[in-house]
């Protein structure tokens, strides 16, 4: 049975959007496929692509921009599927901090970022808006961006809408302030990207492992698809099962984050070709990818039909923003139905 083992590294400690992975384990979906899974948590999220690329771990999770950069830096990894599609990502701040929708209001402020690519993104934006990197103070926060904003260690920081923004909203609610006082300058809008796909969370593989174990990867993805279908069909029941296994997530904050992640879960798991093209171009613009870089993703290990891509991605993003705001106000589980 040792040959059926897969080591899988999360992109951080267990979060609400890791639910398909853990339910595939607890509900026996991996076992049905003859797989013995070892699900690991990183000490440092910045090490994930290096550990997978060096072959110390077989598979794991990472955002699209990091997956692209990893291979460019000599860590051979490939995305084989999507977990969380295009979560809104941007510079988070609180109303009353002196920051406005004008990017130049960040001048003289302390801005937090998760890892080095966040710093590169902000530096590129400062040039675009007539500023210099010296016009702000960069603070590396890891995954503690919301915490640092709350504690006053930074004025703003890069985060995603369904995670760090919800954390800020919960803090505001406890202070008797409206949740809408948590604001975001979306990077896709600031950088004229047309999508938030650079932070799409992906299932990635070590290239050598993928080459030697194609059937094992197919089986893994079948189990993940079954778990994802289960989550999307009955999110409340799925959550109860998840927190029974991960009781540290049994709190209001995690549940609200889960509600906001719900619309972002990829139902098909397919890598979106248009998104990869855009983010590869963005990576070249940021100079983290060489001009001749070829995107490192594949859909060949997914054994069900590929859905059509949305015809108008900008309209889809606009509708998603409205949808997520409604979800925040109503606290419900809803998927966005896009017009044909």
UniProtKB/Swiss-Prot annotation:
Changing residue 199 to A: Attenuates the coordination of ion and is unable to sustain growth in thiamine-free medium. It catalyses: N(6)-(pyridoxal phosphate)-L-lysyl-[4-amino-5-hydroxymethyl-2-methylpyrimidine phosphate synthase] + L-histidyl-[4-amino-5-hydroxymethyl-2-methylpyrimidine phosphate synthase] + 2 Fe(3+) + 4 H2O = L-lysyl-[4-amino-5-hydroxymethyl-2-methylpyrimidine phosphate synthase] + (2S)-2-amino-5-hydroxy-4-oxopentanoyl-[4-amino-5-hydroxymethyl-2-methylpyrimidine phosphate synthase] + 4-amino-2-methyl-5-(phosphooxymethyl)pyrimidine + 3-oxopropanoate + 2 Fe(2+) + 2 H(+). GO terms for molecular function: 4-amino-5-hydroxymethyl-2-methylpyrimidine phosphate synthase activity from histidine and PLP; iron ion binding. The modification N6-(pyridoxal phosphate)lysine is found at residue 62. Its EC number is 2.-.-.-. Pathway: Cofactor biosynthesis; thiamine diphosphate biosynthesis. This is 4-amino-5-hydroxymethyl-2-methylpyrimidine phosphate synthase THI5.
């Amino acid at each position: 049975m040792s040959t059926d083992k897969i080591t899988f590294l999360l992109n951080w400690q267990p979060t609400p959007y890791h639910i398909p992975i853990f339910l595939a384990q607890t509900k026996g979906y991996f076992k049905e496929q003859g797989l013995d899974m070892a699900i690991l948590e990183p000490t440092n999220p910045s090490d994930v692509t290096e550990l997978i690329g060096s072959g110390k771990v077989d598979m794991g999770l990472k955002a699209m921009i990091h997956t692209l950069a990893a291979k460019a830096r000599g860590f051979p990894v490939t995305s084989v599927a999507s977990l969380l599609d295009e979560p809104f990502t941007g510079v988070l701040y609180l109303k009353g901090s002196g920051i406005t929708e004008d990017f130049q209001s960040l001048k003289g402020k302390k801005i937090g970022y998760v890892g080095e690519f966040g710093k590169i993104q902000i530096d590129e934006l400062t040039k675009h808006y007539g500023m210099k990197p010296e016009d702000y103070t960069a603070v590396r926060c890891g995954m503690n961006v919301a915490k640092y904003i709350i504690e006053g260690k930074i004025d703003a920081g890069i985060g995603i809408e369904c995670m760090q923004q919800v954390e800020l909203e919960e803090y505001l609610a406890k202070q008797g302030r409206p949740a809408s006082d948590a604001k975001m300058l979306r990077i896709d809008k600031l950088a004229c990207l047309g999508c938030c796909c650079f932070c799409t969370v992906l299932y990635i593989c070590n290239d050598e492992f993928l080459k030697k174990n194609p059937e094992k990867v197919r089986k893994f993805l079948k189990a993940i698809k079954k778990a994802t279908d289960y989550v999307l069909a009955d999110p409340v029941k799925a959550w109860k099962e998840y927190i029974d296994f991960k009781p540290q997530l049994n709190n209001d904050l995690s549940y609200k984050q889960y509600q906001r992640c719900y619309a972002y879960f990829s139902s098909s798991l397919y890598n979106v070709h248009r998104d990869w093209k855009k983010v590869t171009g963005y990576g070249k613009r940021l100079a983290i990818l060489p001009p001749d870089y070829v995107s490192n993703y594949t859909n060949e290990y997914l054994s069900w039909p590929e859905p059509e891509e949305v015809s108008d991605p900008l309209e889809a993003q606009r509708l998603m923003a409205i949808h997520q705001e409604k979800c925040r106000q109503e606290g419900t589980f809803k998927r966005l139905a896009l017009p044909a």
